[in-house]
């Protein structure tokens, strides 16, 4: 083991753990090499340290995971039920999302949220480090630059994390397979994964419908690939966003590592990818399909969500009614889906319900600036002048270019050739913007997560309104723009937490 400063020079210390603990207590950020990658660690109790950390990592509000030395330390700042305790203490050592308790840790660990992700030490280095000081928790987050996978080599630690970390606590053991920490929350007594990775991979998921060998490349964001064989699906570790060359190389390596582990030397019988033609994962699948002369199956995003749940629950090839709610997925009609009711079998589906289509002026900009989505939705209910009047008091803080940007949005939203979305994520963003909770998304899902935290203190039945559902040609459509108009008409009648709970 070795300890280095930001220039890469070795730090002469009698005891590396004692010295590292002292550096942490002084407010330094330390890169700590583990077994699946390199973490960035800091104190979790000082606002000034967290402010510095966020500036360097360019993560304004995204929640950080915490590592605590023992269960009593966790109980000092979080609430746990017996099932959550069992997962935290289990040998797989995931990050478990828990309800916040007293403000022992800095609010800047997870700003605006009512939960915090917590894990116990799972390596000797982490255990020895906690023996050297008396802190309830350390921030322990993935060591990576934005858009890049987590660093796993000592060389990458210095080249990629230089400027982020003040010191580097490293060892000479090679990390073969990058593996982020797994993240889960307990819902109705069962674990629901936000990220399935270290500790859970390569445990297979048993399914009874699998025939032959299949490779699946997944979507582009929050990716994991998979190999199906002999009635089992072996998912790769969490790979993050596949939007860079480094991300592509990471997925290629993960698939090959899984093939080697399973001793699969032959070509697969089929290759699957998302329906979206521009995803880098789809293009990777196309190339492999052509090189191996293997059929390529393009799966609609939300149909894949539903059939994966069917497979996990051992539902045979029977028709089910599935609901898929998320931020975005490429639809068969070229629009952006995300609030879907699909009558599904494994081989096909019929779209029988959806959220109302709403224009997306500026495309993905709507996901980063929720007020864009709110304005666009209101064009289906109100005139431009009415929208200008409603948004007048907030527009300068809600949009980077204020009234001028609003007028461009209004103009584009009424064009017939504009991209449309039925996304539940964008609808929740609109409510978040409406009650002034989030105007600028700094990480994926932030407006909806803030809304969820606020909703935990509200009562949904306090909002006396039943959303309109209309039948158009055998398809049921929930009118989301009318919900927003109603909430505006009842301005200040309802508490924000009740509106948030109603929207959820």
Please place each PLM-identified region on the residue numbering:
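Active-site-adjacent structural elements in enzyme catalytic cores
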Residues: 1-272, 276-291
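Generic recognition of stable, solvent-exposed alpha-helical segments in well-folded globular domains
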Residues: 15, 48, 69, 124, ...
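Short, hydrophobic/aliphatic alpha-helical segments
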Residues: 13-29, 128-135, 312-324, 403-418
């Amino acid at each position: 083991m070795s300890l280095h400063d930001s220039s890469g020079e070795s730090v002469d210390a009698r005891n590396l753990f004692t010295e590292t603990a002292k550096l942490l207590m002084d407010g330094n950020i330390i890169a700590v090499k583990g077994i699946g990658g390199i973490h960035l660690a800091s104190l979790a109790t000082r606002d000034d340290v967290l402010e510095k950390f966020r500036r360097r990592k360019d993560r304004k509000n995204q929640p950080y995971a915490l590592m605590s030395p023992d269960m009593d330390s966790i109980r000092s700042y979080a609430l746990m039920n017996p099932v959550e305790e069992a997962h935290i203490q289990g040998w797989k050592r995931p990050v478990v999302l828990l309800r916040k308790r007293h403000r022992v840790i800095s609010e800047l660990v997870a700003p605006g949220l009512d939960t915090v992700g917590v894990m116990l030490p799972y390596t000797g280095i982490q255990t020895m480090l906690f023996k050297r000081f008396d802190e309830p928790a350390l921030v322990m987050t993935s060591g990576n630059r934005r858009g890049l996978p987590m660093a796993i080599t000592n060389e990458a630690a210095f080249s990629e994390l230089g400027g982020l970390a003040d010191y580097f606590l490293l060892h000479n053991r090679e990390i073969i397979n990058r593996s982020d920490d797994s993240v889960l929350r307990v819902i109705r007594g069962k674990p629901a994964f936000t990220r399935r990775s270290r500790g859970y991979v390569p445990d297979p998921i048993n399914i009874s419908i699998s025939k032959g060998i299949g490779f699946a490349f997944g979507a582009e964001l929050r990716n994991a690939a998979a190999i199906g064989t002999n009635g089992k699906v072996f998912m790769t570790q969490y790979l993050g966003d596949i939007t860079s060359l480094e991300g592509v190389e990471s997925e290629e390596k993960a698939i090959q590592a899984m093939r080697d582990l399973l001793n699969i030397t032959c070509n697969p019988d089929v290759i699957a990818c998302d329906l979206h033609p521009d995803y880098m994962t789809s293009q990777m699948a196309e190339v492999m399909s052509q090189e191996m002369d293997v059929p390529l199956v393009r799966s609609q995003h939300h149909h894949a969500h539903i059939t994966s749940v069917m497979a996990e629950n051992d539902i045979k090839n029977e028709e089910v009614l599935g609901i898929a709610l998320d931020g975005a997925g490429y639809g068969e009609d070229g629009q952006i889906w995300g609030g879907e009711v699909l009558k599904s079998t494994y081989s096909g589906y019929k779209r029988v319900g959806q959220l109302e289509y709403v224009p997306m002026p500026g495309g993905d900009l709507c996901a980063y600036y929720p007020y864009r989505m709110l304005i666009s939705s209101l064009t289906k209910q109100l005139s431009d002048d009415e929208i200008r009047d409603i948004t007048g008091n907030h527009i300068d803080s809600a949009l980077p270019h204020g009234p001028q940007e609003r007028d461009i949005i209004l103009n584009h939203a009424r064009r017939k050739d504009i991209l449309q979305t039925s996304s539940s994520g964008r609808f929740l963003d609109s409510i978040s913007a409406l009650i002034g909770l989030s105007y600028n998304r700094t990480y994926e899902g932030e407006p909806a997560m803030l809304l969820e935290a606020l909703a935990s203190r509200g009562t949904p039945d306090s909002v006396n309104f039943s959303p309109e559902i209309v039948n158009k040609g055998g398809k049921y459509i929930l009118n989301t723009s009318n919900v927003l108009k109603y909430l505006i008409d009842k301005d200040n009648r309802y508490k924000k937490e009740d509106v948030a709970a109603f929207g959820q």
